Regions:
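N-terminal basic/disordered segments at the start of proteins
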Residues: 1-52
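Small-residue-enriched alpha-helical segments and adjacent helix-cap loops
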Residues: 13, 37-177, 181-186
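Short, flexible, solvent-exposed loop/turn segments with mixed acidic/basic and small polar residues
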Residues: 28-33, 64-70, 201
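Short beta-strand elements
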Residues: 29-30, 167-172, 242
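Short cysteine/histidine-rich metal-coordination sites, predominantly Zn2+-binding motifs
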Residues: 171-175, 209-213, 232-233
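Iron-sulfur cluster-binding cysteine motifs and their immediate structural context
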Residues: 188-207, 219-233
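Cysteine-rich micro-motifs
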Residues: 214, 218
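Single conserved hydrophobic/aromatic residue that forms the stacking wall/gate
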Residues: 235-246
Length: 246
């Protein structure tokens, strides 16, 4: 094991100013000890390379207790780092292109679901969340806000990452726009069959989709062989509610 690793607390008493300073660097005090901290490593949008994985694991072995956890915002947290190892840990991570942070009254790390690759994803969540990360997390890194500000990007209305519970949430959607002229009133309507919430109905021989009941999940895309349901892709931004066509 590396000689720089310290596995036990020296019970070093730290001043509130010292604790606050390192918290601003992404280092949170372990409540069980006066001088042991957990260090948050930013992933950008939950994506890291295998080389970055190895660097984080090496840092955990070298400077912490050898354990790593994931935060709810998809950052990685190196556990059990003594106060005297904090600067060494941050420097080591920096050598591998990694940064620490994600604390305080600032823009917090951006959370993204796997909509880019998920069968239900309607937008490229990885690319969008990466842009948001660079623009707001990195770009506003030194901006102190009245309170922490959280952003999440969801690929569809399944809402896996709960965008609407963040300060700003983005939800990929597809809103169907039935074309009555193309609808042939099929007895076994494929649009009806594909809807998970049973919203589409044949009314007077034509397809009707209640806009208030439709959840915009996009499951009906391409299901009508006659093209009766073209769709408009949207990003839904909650709080405040807005729509932007993509």
């Amino acid at each position: 094991m590396n000689e720089e690793k310290i596995t036990t607390s020296a019970n070093k008493k730290l001043s509130p100013e010292e604790i606050k300073r390192v918290k601003g660097l992404g280092c949170l005090q372990d409540k069980r000890y006066d001088d042991i901290f957990n260090i948050r490593v930013i992933t950008g949008n939950g994506h890291i390379t295998t080389d970055e994985h190895r660097a984080i694991a090496d840092a955990a072995d070298k400077f912490g207790n050898g354990q790593i956890t994931m935060t709810t915002r998809l950052s990685m947290e190196i556990q059990g780092v003594p106060y005297d190892n904090i600067e060494k840990t941050i420097a080591f991570l920096g050598e591998h292109g990694l940064m620490t942070g994600g604390t305080g009254a600032k823009v917090r790390p951006v959370v993204s679901c796997k909509g880019t690759t998920c069968q239900y994803g309607l937008i490229d969540t990885f690319a969008l969340s990466k842009k948001i990360h660079e623009r707001f997390y990195v770009g506003y890194h030194d901006v102190v806000l009245p309170h922490k500000f959280k952003i999440a990007v969801g690929g569809c209305p399944n809402n896996c990452v709960k965008p609407n519970l963040n300060d700003m949430g983005i939800i990929g959607q597809r809103i169907p726009k039935p074309d009555s002229e193309k609808c042939r009133g099929c007895k076994k309507c494929q649009i009806e069959k594909s809807c998970p919430v049973h919203v589409p109905k044949l009314v007077d021989g034509k397809l009707y989709i209640d806009p208030e009941e439709c959840i915009h999940c996009g499951r009906c895309k391409g299901k009508c062989p006659f093209g009766a349901v073209p769709e408009l892709s949207l990003i839904h931004i909650s709080e405040p509610t807005r729509h932007a066509q993509i």
